């Protein structure tokens, strides 16, 4: 099944997250594997509106290997074209010698370097349940200053 949780981007930094209005000038976006899908839709919505100046720091996109990265060409093209407000950082479990990004697991130090600080920011996360859990990304985001209410989560699930 696809992601659970209702998060709607209404434009120019405005969201409805689980029924509550939210606003952010900057977005910290985290995705694991196919969790890129709803995050990609938000990026696409922001970039198609020339008046939307929301900054997106899609700092962490985690996969097992480089070949598992979905939509990489599109993400890299957007990062190049919109370098003033869209950044992407990849993390893979295993990489070749020429890999220019991070290897291993997404952790607090990677988030501190590649995500915006929590002031005027909202973090969007989507990935398998273990990385969205209390043992995954949430504690690291809280440690760098994000409040739990500022981290709407699209929860990917494999349940039928």
Curated annotation (Swiss-Prot):
Coiled-coil zones: none
Co-factor remark: Binds 1 FAD. Binds 1 heme group. The heme group is called cytochrome b-557.
Taxonomic superkingdom: Eukaryota
InterPro entries: CBR-like (IPR001834), Flavoprot_Pyr_Nucl_cyt_Rdtase (IPR001709), FNR_nucleotide-bd (IPR039261), OxRdtase_FAD/NAD-bd (IPR001433)
GO biological process, one term: nitrate assimilation
Keyword Oxidoreductase carried by entry: yes
Binding site for FAD: 37
Keyword line: FAD, Flavoprotein, Heme, Iron, Metal-binding, Molybdenum, NAD, Nitrate assimilation, Oxidoreductase
Enzyme Commission identifier(s): 1.7.1.1
One Pfam family recorded for the sequence: NAD_binding_1
Disulfide bonds: none
Cofactor(s) of this protein: FAD; heme; Mo-molybdopterin
S-adenosyl-L-methionine among keywords: no
Catalyzed chemical reaction(s): nitrite + NAD(+) + H2O = nitrate + NADH + H(+)
GO terms, molecular function: FAD binding; metal ion binding; nitrate reductase (NADH) activity
Similarity remark: Belongs to the nitrate reductase family.
Self-association and partners: Homodimer.
Function, in words: Nitrate reductase is a key enzyme involved in the first step of nitrate assimilation in plants, fungi and bacteria.
Protein name, entry field: Nitrate reductase [NADH]
Gene: NIA
């Amino acid at each position: 099944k696809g992601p659970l949780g209702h998060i709607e981007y209404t434009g120019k930094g405005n969201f409805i997250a689980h029924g509550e209005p939210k606003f952010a000038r900057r977005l910290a976006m985290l995705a694991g594997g196919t969790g890129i899908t709803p995050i990609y839709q938000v990026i696409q919505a922001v970039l198609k509106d020339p008046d939307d100046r929301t900054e997106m720091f899609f700092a962490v996109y985690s996969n097992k290997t480089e070949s598992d990265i979905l939509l990489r060409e599109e993400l890299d093209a957007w990062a190049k074209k919109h370098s003033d407000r869209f950044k992407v950082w990849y993390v893979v479990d295993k990489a070749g010698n020429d890999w220019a990004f991070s290897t291993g697991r997404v952790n607090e130090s990677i988030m501190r370097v590649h995500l915006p600080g929590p002031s005027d920011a909202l973090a969007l996360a989507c990935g398998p349940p273990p990385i969205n859990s209390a043992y995954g990304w949430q504690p690291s985001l809280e440690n760098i200053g994000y409040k739990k209410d500022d981290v709407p989560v699209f929860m990917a699930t494999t349940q039928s």
